[in-house]
């Protein structure tokens, strides 16, 4: 499958969706192209994913300062307690509105990551990588 870019237009903005083979290996390049001011990235991932998935993503993001959290993808994780722990870590690591949160996994972690990114500094960048 060829890599494909789809543009989603909303009332307030447009954003790209990328999909295709080996797209995880190109994440760093795509971030640099679309979000050139990002310096720090927090990956919030499913601890049940194979380590090879994390390794591919981390290798692609080697030029960025990374914080990595792995959680169980269950409803207990989608809580204010967990969100506040992540937000505190982001603030302690001086994340700002030009930095980024990446969700790596399913819906629970995507919801949690989107929530965290929207609350931190009135909204930092968010990327969802569903598995």
Say what each PLM segment does.
Residues 78-131:
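Glycine/threonine-rich beta-strand-loop-alpha-helix active-site module
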Residues 1-100:
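ATP/NTP phosphate-donor binding region
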